[in-house]
Regions:
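Glycine-rich flexible loops
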Residues: 1-217
Length: 217
């Protein structure tokens, strides 16, 4: 719930995105309900099994619940997913001139690439959820053309950190593009930097420290 409040206050969610977390040691996951505002209570977290059956929680499921269901099914390594509609990251999906790449240290978390799912429609069906999971592949995140982004993590700290720095990197890249030709980080350097950040978990600790402060009621 702290993660939701943090992302809402930071403008990532604004009533349209959603967060999910796999429940450890089970074949179930929690997903924030449809039309959730800044205020969140335990019943706003819906619990589903891998057959799509709702086990707990109150309220309607998000229309794009297949995003979470199909990625969890396809990626046993993923334990948390965030879908949001970041202004700057999404802008790069509609540019014929620029492809979003790491341009800032923390953006190297996505040095493995940012595949684009080329369907702007809501991921509201099983078929589209499967297609998105396929587009994501083994990557940390994917962009949805003219729509938004999906960020995964081994835990909630990783997914929140990923969403935070995906949008920050996109914002910095946008500013660089407006100044002229952007100077992207060399891929080899980006891969080395990413490995170090992931190994030390420094970014995760720092972002989660902000969540602990800003995510209170």
């Amino acid at each position: 719930m702290k993660a939701w409040r943090f992302l809402y206050r930071r403008g990532f969610i604004e009533g349209f995105g959603h967060i999910s977390v796999r429940l450890p040691g089970t074949d179930t996951y929690m997903l924030t309900r449809h039309s959730l505002g800044r205020i969140i209570v335990p019943d706003d977290m819906l619990v589903y099994d891998m057959n799509g059956k709702q086990l707990a929680g109150k309220g309607d499921r998000p229309g794009e619940a297949p995003i979470h269901h199909e990625i969890f099914r396809a990626r046993p390594d993923v334990n948390s997913i965030i879908h949001y509609h970041g202004m700057h990251a999404t802008a790069f999906t509609t540019s014929a001139e620029h492809t979003l790449r790491p341009i800032h240290l923390m953006g190297t978390l996505f040095a493995d690439g940012l595949p684009i799912y080329n369907d702007p429609r809501l991921v509201s069906t099983t078929e589209r959820g499967v297609a998105l999971a396929k587009a994501l592949g083994s990557h940390r995140a994917a962009l949805l053309y003219a729509h938004g982004g999906v960020v995964t993590g081994g835990d909630i700290e990783e997914s929140v950190t990923g969403a935070f720095f995906l949008e920050e990197n996109a914002h910095r890249a946008y500013l660089s593009c407006t100044l002229g030709k952007p100077k992207w980080i060399d891929p080899e350097v980006a891969n080395d930097a990413a490995a170090e950040l992931i190994r030390t978990r420094g970014p995760m600790r720092r972002v989660w420290a902000m969540v602990e402060i800003e995510g209170v009621e």
